[in-house]
């Protein structure tokens, strides 16, 4: 999954790294335990990896192999893959990146994949064979299906302990709650998924993500009651009604096409992070944003041009889009991190709260900076293209300050 909502992470000082860590948690990044790419990275980081590129079923796989790449298009015999393999990937990987071998496209029978396998990747482009009941072992926690895969799931097809399921771009089948394992926590849908948003029966799901560029235009019918993380389709542009969003939702990301007014009571009190897509341009009326909201971000190329007001005091992180240039007269009292737009050029005297620790001002900002304008606890200050001399004492003593940083290293986000 990729998104223009992702912030940039370029600075390397200790405070900046800590900021990036917090910002990723607040803004867009999928929570670590819901991320489809974090489990295997941890596996590689925390254990000794022995990779093997299996180029023919007649070749013997080393018994020490724990990461196996299937690089052929022939049936896989039963009981051949050793019971030490943890990561099974139907794609050939070399040290310089991924290179495709022959696309595997054969049925997988029970007993083919050993009980040790936890992560299964059909990254090859053509795989589209129906899954066979109980062929994927109960040890499997993560399943990534190829872009061509478009087979409906039947009872027993998916492992009973599956935590994360990611479908490819051509998958467009409804999800039957009776055949989806109760262990499933995270579901990632490809660009082509265009079934009704009727997921209320998937009660174990806590993370639901539509891929960037998704074509799904359908309204929400029901969402999982325990959902905490929701990223809607870029084509979604329907009103959000009261009670539509789950009561435990913490992070909500609207796609690029969403531009509906938000009414009081439509966003659940549990919401901590909200991210708006490209075309969103609606005012924030009083009491619309939940009291305990922690972060607000706008798309990099956001159209948002409304007055930035009625923001809850507990908000700690704000990121504006590239062109936002409305005067800001007040900011939340608990704010720690702010990224003004590249076009912002209004006075900030008396605007920045004492809680602020990280501040980015874009290349259009040319207002005078004087002692006392920045709070004394500021840790990171970036002025991208500031043309004027800065009087002594303006930048707090312990602040990591960069003026006119090099291209690509100018964002605190």
UniProtKB/Swiss-Prot annotation:
Entry superkingdom: Eukaryota
FNIP repeats, residue ranges: 104-148, 149-192, 222-257, 258-301, 304-343, 344-386
Organism, as annotated: Dictyostelium discoideum
Pfam families: FNIP (PF05725)
Record keywords: Calmodulin-binding, Repeat
Disulphides: none
Oligomeric form and interacting partners: Interacts with calmodulin in the presence of Ca(2+).
Entry keyword annotation includes Repeat: yes
Keyword Oxidoreductase: no
Record protein name field: Calmodulin-binding protein CmbB
MF (Gene Ontology): calmodulin binding
């Amino acid at each position: 999954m990729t998104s223009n909502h992702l912030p940039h992470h370029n600075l390397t000082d200790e405070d900046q790294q800590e900021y990036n860590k917090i910002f990723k948690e607040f803004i867009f990044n999928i929570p670590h335990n819901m991320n489809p790419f974090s489990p295997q990275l941890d596996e590689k980081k925390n254990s000794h990896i022995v990779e093997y590129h299996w180029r023919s079923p007649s070749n013997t796989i080393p018994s020490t192999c724990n990461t196996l790449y299937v690089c052929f298009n022939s049936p896989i015999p039963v009981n051949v893959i050793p019971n030490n393999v943890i990561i099974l990937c139907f794609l050939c990987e070399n040290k310089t990146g991924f290179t495709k071998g022959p696309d595997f496209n054969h049925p997988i029978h029970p007993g083919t994949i050993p009980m040790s396998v936890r992560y299964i990747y059909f990254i090859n482009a053509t795989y589209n064979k129906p899954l066979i009941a109980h062929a994927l072992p109960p040890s499997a926690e993560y399943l990534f299906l190829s872009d061509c895969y478009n087979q409906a799931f039947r009872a027993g097809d998916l492992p009973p302990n599956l935590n994360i399921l990611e479908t490819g771009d051509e998958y467009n089948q409804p999800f039957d709650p009776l055949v989806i394992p109760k262990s499933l926590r995270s579901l990632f849908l490809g660009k082509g998924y265009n079934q009704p948003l009727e997921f209320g029966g998937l009660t174990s799901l806590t993370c639901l993500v539509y891929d960037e560029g998704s074509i799904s235009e359908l309204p929400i019918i029901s969402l999982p009651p325990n959902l905490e993380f929701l990223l809607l389709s870029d084509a979604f542009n329907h009103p959000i009604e009261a009670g539509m969003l789950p009561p435990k939702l913490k992070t909500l990301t609207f796609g690029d096409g969403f531009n509906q007014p938000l009414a009081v009571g439509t966003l659940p009190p549990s919401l901590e992070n909200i991210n708006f897509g490209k075309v969103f341009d609606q005012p924030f009326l009083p009491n619309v944003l939940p009291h305990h909201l922690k972060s607000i971000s706008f798309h990099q190329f956001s159209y948002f041009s409304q007055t930035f007001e009625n923001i809850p005091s507990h908000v700690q992180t704000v990121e504006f889009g590239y062109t936002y240039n409305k005067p800001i007269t007040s900011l939340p009292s608990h704010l720690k991190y702010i990224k003004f737009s590249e076009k912002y050029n209004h006075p900030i005297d008396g605007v920045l709260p004492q809680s602020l620790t990280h501040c980015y001002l874009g290349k259009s900002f040319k207002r005078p900076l004087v002692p006392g304008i920045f709070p004394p606890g500021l840790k990171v200050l970036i002025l991208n293209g500031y043309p004027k001399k800065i009087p002594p004492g303006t930048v707090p003593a312990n602040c990591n300050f960069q003026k006119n940083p090099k291209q690509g290293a100018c964002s605190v986000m």
